[in-house]
């Protein structure tokens, strides 16, 4: 299945070695998808667990569609991942709630920052405090990203449920589309504002109750178009201000030169000046 909305996510290269491939083989693809779909991390009994898509129950059919394989293949991959302790799958009425064991998705950059700091900086009593502060800031940053996805998903659920007249929940693709919006830097409050505008615009156009917004991806383009237009407008305004300052500087320079020419006692002549005949 083609995915037009691709986005980067952090993982460790150690996962891509023969030890892991010997254990789980092609199931590694499903495991990587779980990592990319992790929306938050929790710690339980000293173990970090990555919560996949906010613990939305996933059906084998949904996961099979991601890779274009059969449901039987997905079930075999899930069994391998569970047996080798890569994931924990909890059966729910409408699918499986997946957790990634020893999740490091959101600590990836923090770890690199700390190791780099220890290598590059000389020891001083203040260094640990500075690094601790950096770790806290980084953790807060990724926690904020998780919360952003959850807030947007919650509002999308409310809007869709109101439109459908029944309770509906975001799909895995919805969560991925939301994560992309967060990743490109759209503020949560602005995302929710545009999301509401998107639903309102749809309501104004629809002619039948059966016409509803089925996926967040429909709203993604609406949000992205406005965000990029807003960014372009800001950049144009900044460029305009720079040009104005540049023009003012040039005008001041030219004015100064003109003043010098006007106050010359020789009228601009140089060399020997002949006396006027009377």
UniProtKB/Swiss-Prot annotation:
Residues 58-80 bind DNA. The keyword DNA-binding applies. GO terms for molecular function: DNA binding. InterPro entries: WH_DNA-bd_sf (IPR036390). Residues 117-136, 239-278 are annotated as: Disordered. The keyword DNA damage does not apply. Residues 248-263 have a biased composition (Basic and acidic residues). Keywords: DNA-binding. To B.subtilis YqaL. This is Phage-like element PBSX protein XkdB. It comes from Bacillus subtilis (strain 168). The lineage of its organism: Bacteria, Bacillati, Bacillota, Bacilli, Bacillales.
